[in-house]
From Swiss-Prot:
SUPFAM superfamilies: Release factor. Gene3D superfamilies: 3.30.160.20, 3.30.70.1660, 6.10.140.1950. One of its GO terms (cellular component) is cytoplasm. It comes from Streptomyces griseus subsp. griseus (strain JCM 4626 / CBS 651.72 / NBRC 13350 / KCC S-0626 / ISP 5235). Disulfide bonds: none annotated. HAMAP family: Rel_fac_1. This is Peptide chain release factor 1. Methylated by PrmC. Methylation increases the termination efficiency of RF1. GO terms for molecular function: translation release factor activity, codon specific. It is found in: Cytoplasm. InterPro entries: PCRF, Pep_chain_release_fac_I, Pep_chain_release_fac_I_sf, Prokaryotic/Mito_RF, RF-1. Belongs to the prokaryotic/mitochondrial release factor family. Pfam families: PCRF, RF-1.
Length: 358
């Protein structure tokens, strides 16, 4: 059943020998790469060994049970254990997303629905900030444009693991969970400005990209156009009398990133470059995978109510994820950051699809 694992065991053994050689660690970048791959393979190897050992234990128990019926119960218990180990191993063999260890940049944009959409974008921001707090991630608002009523027309947030340099364990980065949030989120509720109690529908778009490191994307200075301007607050009010806001355009691709939240032009430029690197990395990955059914490609760039991935229905206190058929009636808790159940439903559906195609 798991013939391919033997090759992985061979690779794991080879890596173990290489990492035991002190000379390998002279090249730190290569050593990190080897260590990362070794860490990825270790749980597969240990689980496979447990799977084989359990199979041998079952055969032994069956031989004893032929002479002593008291061993029949032990056979059943071992068979149950092997089923659990088999499923665990199958999941470990699901093709990994190479970005799963990365931190992310999260962008929320108000869409159809005017002020109500901007308020909903603010609700989504709070939901993600609370979720990050619950799981122990760090967040940093990089850039934002507030609306008149206190919501957001656009807001960009960096979400990081505690270390701030991606996951310490394979597949445990922010991207591994947050990548499923990309798309159009629809809200159904009675706005505070609605005098007749009618339910309105509006939407906000969420874009999630893995945060790129400088080594991930090569950017040439002569490919950039950098514009500076005065940052502004809600309604266009000037909040800065100097040209500290920065907009960077990558001329070959037309990708644009901007930042105005920091106090100095240099800080805004650094933040805008972070955003630009991540957007270019995401664009390159999408181009390379355009023939594949990768979840990242389902993220919707245009905020159109008809292209929804999720609905937040306030009158029914219901949240629905239309991609996986998830439905729950605890919207108030979800908006307070209890997102694990809906995200896990997406993780499970993605794993099942990858297993089916493996």
């Amino acid at each position: 059943m798991f013939e391919a694992v033997e090759e992985l065991i061979g690779e794991h053994t080879g890596l173990e020998k290489k990492l035991a050689d002190p000379s390998v660690h002279a090249d730190q970048a290569n050593a990190r790469k080897l260590n990362k791959r070794y860490a990825e393979l270790t749980p597969i190897v240990s689980t496979y060994r447990a799977w084989k050992q359990t199979g041998e234990d079952i055969e032994t128990a069956r031989e004893f049970a032929a002479d002593d019926p008291d061993f029949a119960a032990e056979v059943k218990e071992l068979e149950k254990q092997r089923e659990e180990i088999t499923e665990k191993l199958r999941l470990l063999l699901v093709p990994r997303d190479p970005s799963d260890d990365k931190d992310v940049l999260l962008e929320i944009k108000a869409g159809a629905g005017g002020d109500e959409s901007a308020l909903f974008a603010g609700d989504l921001l709070r939901m993600y900030l609370r979720y990050a707090e619950r799981v122990g991630w760090k967040t940093e608002i990089i850039d934002s444009t507030e609306s008149e009523l206190g919501g957001y027309k656009d807001v960009q947030v960096a979400v990081k693991t505690k270390g701030g340099n991606g996951a310490t364990e394979p597949g445990q980065g922010v991207w591994a969970r947050m990548k499923y949030e990309g798309g159009v989120h629809r809200v159904q509720r009675v706005p505070s400005t609605e005098s007749q109690g009618r339910i309105h529908t509006s939407a906000a778009g969420v874009l999630v990209t893995p945060e790129a490191e400088e080594v991930d994307v090569e950017i040439h200075a002569n490919d950039l156009r950098i514009d500076v301007y005065r940052s502004s607050g809600p309604g266009g009010q000037s909040v800065n009398t100097t040209d500290s806001a920065v907009r960077i355009t990558h001329l070959p691709t037309g990708v644009v990133a901007s930042c105005q939240n920091e106090k100095s032009q240099l800080q805004n430029k650094e933040q805008a470059m972070r955003i630009l690197r991540s957007r270019l990395l995401a664009a390159a990955q999408e181009a390379a995978e355009q023939e594949a059914s990768d979840v990242r490609r389902s993220q919707v760039r245009t905020v159109d109510r008809s292209e929804k991935i999720r609905t937040y229905n306030f009158p029914e206190n219901r949240i629905s994820d239309h991609r996986v058929g998830f439905k729950a009636y605890n919207l108030d808790q979800v908006l307070d950051g209890e997102l694990d159940a809906v995200i896990q439903a997406c993780v499970d559906a993605d794993s099942a699809a990858k297993l089916a195609n493996a």
